[in-house]
Design a protein with these regions (language model features):
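Short, well-ordered beta-strand segments
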Residues: 25-29, 74, 122, 169, ...
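Alpha-helical "hinge/linker" immediately C-terminal to small N-terminal DNA-binding modules
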Residues: 1-17
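C-terminal effector-binding regulatory domain of bacterial HTH transcription factors
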Residues: 52, 174-183, 193-257
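Acidic, Gly/Pro-rich loop/turn segments at junctions of secondary structure
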Residues: 49, 58-152
């Protein structure tokens, strides 16, 4: 009887430890625009599955911040370069050149990058990615030069300006404008010209990776974002041609830098 009781006590202890491994706080860094409009509904789904895990939302931290332990999980634009990180693709960011129908009615549709000199351009200059300097069509590359430029670190402020017929942008993230495209309030410009898509990643430090709650959230979040961003592309493809996705088969691997 005594060995049986010891085995039962050990089982209870293991189950308690397992439950505690899925309790606690995770500090998540996300791009500010995505955090403002999309993130909370996604996290509600996760917390329905893991109610004992609390997610703390931070904005715009870099891979060096992640490496320093300022957050536990971060979304990064482009392949992480610093050592000591654990990463998985969350899918690609697609960037589209757009303007409002009202703006185009007043100022005309730019068809090629050189015609941007006749337009007011809104330029994203925030911390999430580098400023767009060129556009690509096939093997051709052309510089982006506006007649007038307004720079902003706030992608949502740029979206608002576009919707208010105030100018054009050549690199609006699809995630921020998919509903506007479907409603026709924003219209694709510069047919065939794009800022090339950028693969994005979920990353954590190797130290945080040892926490089970981080591992569980990390993989759930990466796959949820892959599905979400693929759904945006599927919706948008009905109204605009998108760049080919050559990386689609390579998004299931967790790797270390």
């Amino acid at each position: 009887m005594e060995p049986l009781l010891r085995a039962h006590a050990s089982l209870i202890s293991d189950l308690t430890s397992e439950a505690r491994a899925l309790e606690g706080n995770i500090r998540l860094s996300s791009a500010p625009g995505f955090a403002s409009r999309r993130l909370t509904s996604l996290l509600q789904r996760f917390q329905a599955e893991q109610p004992a895990i609390t997610i703390e939302i931070l904005s715009g931290l870099s891979e060096s911040d992640l490496q320093k332990g300022l957050c536990d999980v971060a979304t990064l634009t482009g392949l992480p370069a610093l050592p000591g990180l654990v990463c998985m693709s969350r899918g690609r960011n697609v960037y589209l050149p757009v303007a409002s129908a009202g703006y185009l009615k007043k100022h005309g549709m730019p068809l090629t990058p050189d015609q941007l000199r006749a337009h007011t351009g809104y330029v994203y200059a925030g911390p999430v990615r580098h400023e767009t300097k060129v556009l690509v069509r096939g093997d051709r590359t052309e510089p982006v030069v506006f007649g007038q430029s307004i720079r902003s670190t706030d992608i949502l402020a740029i979206r608002t300006a576009l919707l208010n017929d105030m100018g054009v942008a050549v690199d609006m993230p699809l995630v921020q404008i998919v509903e506007d495209l479907l409603a026709g309030t924003l219209v694709p410009i510069l047919p065939g010209w794009f800022r090339p898509p950028v693969e994005c990643y979920i990353a954590t430090s190797r130290t945080a990776w040892h926490l089970k709650r981080v591992r569980v959230f990390f993989e759930w979040y990466a796959r949820a974002l892959q599905a979400l961003f693929a759904s945006y592309e599927a919706q948008a493809s009905a109204v605009v041609g998108l760049p080919r996705d050559d990386e689609a088969a390579e998004r299931s691997t967790i790797f270390r830098t």
